[in-house]
Amino acid sequence: VKADLPKKQKGAVAIEFAMVFIIFFAVFYALVSYSVPLLMVQSFNKATAEAVRRSVALDPATPGYDAALIARAKNTLREQLTWIPQAFNFNANNASDATVTYAGGLLTVRVHYSTDKLRQVIPFLVLPGLGSVPALPANLSAQSSLQF
């Protein structure tokens, strides 16, 4: 003989499941939606630091040193960020995504990626009382500098 739950208990189980599912989904969505921007920012930090680090190896006696230094930093930045898929619309050659400057002996490598581009890949939820999830700044950015 199979023992079955009374109807009142079946309804309680359904309500409990609905509440647990909402909490589970919220945690899962937050984990997924925040991990991609965090991964990108860490990659930007590593790429800018590596671009500056590799530029140090360039001989200052090289003809056209300033241009060669900027070119080396840009190439390194591009190499380090090749893993970013095309869907993210990131272009290290584009001045709106990355800049390399050398002025007064200061080499600065910057990456600034618009969150609007990220919205094309990750769906942002707008929750009443909380706002947009994930809550991100207007730009994901990183910068490394070195005084020569």
Predicted features and spans:
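Alpha-helical assembly-interface signal, strongest on the long, hydrophobic N-terminal helix that forms
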Residues: 2-78
